[in-house]
A protein has these predicted regions:
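Non-catalytic signal-transmission and effector/linker regions of two-component phosphorelay proteins
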Residues: 1-24, 28-38, 127-144
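Hydrophobic/aromatic residues positioned on beta-strands within the core alpha/beta folds
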Residues: 100-102, 124
């Protein structure tokens, strides 16, 4: 018998039960990435696979429908987070699995990415935004 599957939120491709959730961060800050790597490892252990890319072009090869959560810095060098957002969708990453990160005020982010265009927009520096982000992570990791 084949592996059991659950229907993902996006309904695009099945998600294997028991497989680690694939979380990808595309950001120019290695320190920011290491802080999230530590949080994910401590909070979820082997339930999460974390990948970090500084170069958005290199990240493109890793993107596909098997991504559980894609975190994109809006202020990426080269072509920016908005462009990577569009390219990720073109590679099969569901918009409901993409979170936009920025140091801009949340109100500005919501104007650039209205409700429903992505899973969430998160200000990197506001603690209440970080708490909301942890709730999103909990939901994704514990969903299946």
């Amino acid at each position: 018998m084949s592996e059991p599957y659950l229907k993902p939120v996006s309904a695009e491709h099945p998600v294997e039960i028991g497989r680690p959730k694939r979380v990808i961060l595309v950001d120019e800050s290695a320190l920011y990435a290491e802080s999230w790597r530590a949080v994910l490892a401590c909070r979820y252990g082997p339930a999460v696979s974390f990948e970090f890319y500084r170069d958005p072009i290199a990240a493109l090869d890793a993107l596909g429908p098997d991504v559980s959560l894609l975190l994109v810095d809006l202020e990426l060098p080269l072509f920016g987070g908005r462009k990577l957002f569009e390219l990720a969708k073109g590679r099969g990453v569901a918009c409901r699995r993409i979170v936009i990160l920025s140091s801009r005020p949340a109100e500005d982010l919501h104007q650039l990415f209205p409700d429903g265009s992505c899973l969430a927009v998160i200000n990197k520096t506001e603690s209440n935004q970080q708490n909301a982000f942890l709730m999103i992570l909990d939901s994704i990791v514990k969903r299946h």
